[in-house]
From Swiss-Prot:
A cellular-component GO term for this protein: cytosol
BP GO terms, sorted: glycine biosynthetic process from serine; tetrahydrofolate interconversion
Catalytic activity: (6R)-5,10-methylene-5,6,7,8-tetrahydrofolate + glycine + H2O = (6S)-5,6,7,8-tetrahydrofolate + L-serine
Pfam families: SHMT
Residues of the site described as Plays an important role in substrate specificity: H229
Keyword Transferase: yes
Its biological purpose: Catalyzes the reversible interconversion of serine and glycine with tetrahydrofolate (THF) serving as the one-carbon carrier. This reaction serves as the major source of one-carbon groups required for the biosynthesis of purines, thymidylate, methionine, and other important biomolecules. Also exhibits THF-independent aldolase activity toward beta-hydroxyamino acids, producing glycine and aldehydes, via a retro-aldol mechanism.
Protein name: Serine hydroxymethyltransferase
NCBIfam families listed in its UniProt record: PRK00011.1 (NF000586)
Gene name in the database record: glyA
The keyword Transcription is assigned to this record: no
Annotated (6S)-5,6,7,8-tetrahydrofolate binding sites: L121, G125, H126, L127, S355, P356, F357
Length: 418
C-alpha cells in the first residue's frame, strides 16, 4: 500500500537528494532576494499535513462537497486572523498566489479593456501591474506611471495629472522593487478625484504593515491584495482584503468559481499559522529589525561612490543599487555573487537603459537574513562582502576569501539546524 512507502528519503532517494541539496544551499548561502524568507517549522508542518487530501470547493459553511467540517474550521481561523492582523472587515485566503489575488481583484473591479493606471515595471512595479507580456497587460488597457527622474521617488502631483489625462477606472499602487514608503492616502485622493477604484498590492510590505512599521493601505484602498510569504513569512500564497461588503462578494466569486476550483486547505492552514505568528508582539520587533538591517546595509553602499543607491535610501525591506561602475551589468553581478554564496537578483532601475535580461542594478532585501537572527552589524558586513566581491570580480583569491567569510556568517546563524 502507498501508506507503507515511508518517508521521502527512503522512497525516492533521487528526489530527496535534490531537496537535501536545497536545504544545504539555504543553510550556507546568504539569502538577499527581497521576495524570499524563511518560514517556521510550524508553517511547514501545517502545509505538509493531511489537509492536502481534502477537496473543499466553495467557502466555509457553503461547500460543494461533504466532509468539510474540519477544513471549515481551518479556513475560518485563517480568515479571522487575517482580518484581525490587518484591520480589515473581509478577507479571502483562497488565492493560490499574489498574481491570482491580483487577477481576482481586477475581475471584481473592472471589465476587460478598461483603462488602469499602474506602476511601470522598470520603476519598481510588478508584472501583474500591466506588463504587456502578462495577463494584466493583455486583458486591460494599462497606462504606466513612473517615478520622478531626479528623486527616483513617486511624484503624487504628476500621478494626479496623469490620472486626469487618462481617466482610469482603476489605479494600482504597490511595487516589487520600490524602496520608499508609499502614501496610500494620497493615492486614494487621486483615485477619488478621477472617480477610480484604488487597489493596493502590498505583497512585499505585508509583514511590515501587519507589524505597524509601515503605513497600512487597508483604510484607503477599495481592495488590498498580498502574498503571504515575503515579509509576512508564511507559505507561498495569496490574500485579498476589503472593507466593502459588496466588493467582498465579488472577490469571493472571482476567486471561486471565477479563477480557481478547490482551495489548497493545507496551504490555508499554513497561512493561519503565519497569521498567528504575525499577531504575536514579537513580530513587530522582527519587522522593525528588517527595516533597521536594510537601512544599515543600504548606507554602506551609499557611502561608496563606486555604487549608486537608487532614490538615495530605503524606508522598507528592500533597496536597489546601480552596479555598472564596477561590473558590466546586474546579471553578471548576480552570477558572480552566486559563486560566493550570496543570493540576490538583477533588477531594472528607473529609466533603465539595458535589457531586462541584463539590467543596470541589483535588488537587495533583508527579510530572510533577519529571520536568521542577523542584525545591523551583520548587515553591514554583508554589504562590504558584496562590494568586495564585485570590485574584485576577476580576483579568485579574493572571491575565495569572501566565500569563507560568508560561511563563517551562516555557521554563526544556523537556519533549521540546531
Amino acid at each position: 500500500m502507498i501508506f507503507d512507502k515511508g518517508n521521502v528519503e527512503d522512497f525516492d532517494k533521487e528526489l530527496w537528494d535534490a531537496i537535501h541539496a536545497e536545504e544545504e544551499r539555504q543553510e550556507h548561502h546568504i539569502e538577499l532576494i527581497a521576495s524570499e524568507n524563511m518560514v517556521s517549522k510550524a508553517v511547514m508542518a501545517a502545509q505538509g499535513s493531511v489537509l492536502t487530501n481534502k477537496y473543499a470547493e466553495g467557502y466555509p459553511g457553503n461547500r460543494y462537497y461533504g466532509g468539510t467540517e474540519c477544513v471549515d474550521i481551518v479556513e475560518t481561523l485563517a480568515i479571522e486572523r487575517a482580518k484581525k492582523l490587518f484591520g480589515a472587515a473581509f478577507a479571502n485566503v483562497q488565492a493560490h498566489s499574489g498574481s491570482q489575488a491580483n487577477a481576482a481583484a481586477y475581475m471584481a473591479l473592472i471589465e476587460a479593456g478598461d483603462t488602469v493606471l499602474g506602476m511601470d515595471l522598470a520603476a519598481g512595479g510588478h508584472l501583474t501591474h500591466g506588463s504587456p507580456v502578462n495577463f494584466s497587460g493583455k486583458t486591460y488597457h494599462f497606462v504606466s506611471y513612473s517615478v520622478d527622474a531626479d528623486t527616483e521617488m513617486l511624484n503624487y502631483e504628476a500621478i494626479l495629472e496623469q490620472a486626469k489625462a487618462v481617466q482610469p477606472k482603476l489605479i494600482v499602487a504597490g511595487a516589487s522593487a520600490y524602496s520608499r514608503s508609499i502614501d496610500f492616502e494620497k493615492f486614494r485622493a487621486i483615485a477619488d478625484h478621477v472617480g477610480a477604484y484604488l487597489m493596493v498590492d502590498m505583497a512585499h510590505i505585508a509583514g511590515l504593515v501587519a507589524a505597524g512599521v509601515h503605513p497600512s493601505p487597508v483604510p484607503y484602498a477599495h481592495i488590498v491584495t498580498s502574498t503571504t510569504h515575503k515579509t509576512l513569512r508564511g507559505p507561498r500564497g495569496g490574500l485579498i482584503l476589503t472593507n466593502d461588503e459588496a466588493l467582498a462578494k465579488k472577490i469571493n466569486s472571482a476567486v471561486f468559481p471565477g479563477l480557481q476550483g478547490g482551495p489548497l486547505e493545507h496551504v490555508i492552514a499554513a497561512k493561519a499559522v503565519a497569521f498567528k505568528e504575525a499577531l504575536d508582539p514579537a513580530f513587530k520587533d522582527y519587522a522593525q529589525a528588517i527595516i533597521d538591517n536594510t537601512a544599515a546595509m543600504a548606507a554602506v553602499f551609499a557611502q561608496d561612490d563606486r555604487f549608486r543607491l537608487i532614490s538615495g535610501g530605503t524606508d522598507n525591506h528592500v533597496f536597489l543599487v546601480d552596479v555598472t561602475k564596477v561590473i558590466a551589468n546586474g546579471k553578471l553581478a548576480q552570477n558572480l555573487l552566486d559563486e560566493v554564496n550570496i543570493t540576490l537578483n538583477k533588477n531594472a532601475i528607473p529609466f533603465e537603459t539595458l535589457s531586462p535580461f541584463k539590467t543596470s542594478g541589483i535588488r537587495i532585501g533583508c527579510a530572510a537574513i533577519t529571520s536568521r537572527g542577523m542584525g545591523v552589524k551583520e548587515s553591514q558586513t554583508i554589504a562590504r562582502l558584496i562590494i568586495k566581491a564585485l570590485v574584485n570580480h576577476d580576483q579568485e583569491t579574493i572571491l575565495e576569501e569572501v566565500r569563507q567569510e560568508v560561511r563563517q556568517l551562516t555557521d554563526a546563524f544556523p537556519l533549521y539546524k540546531k
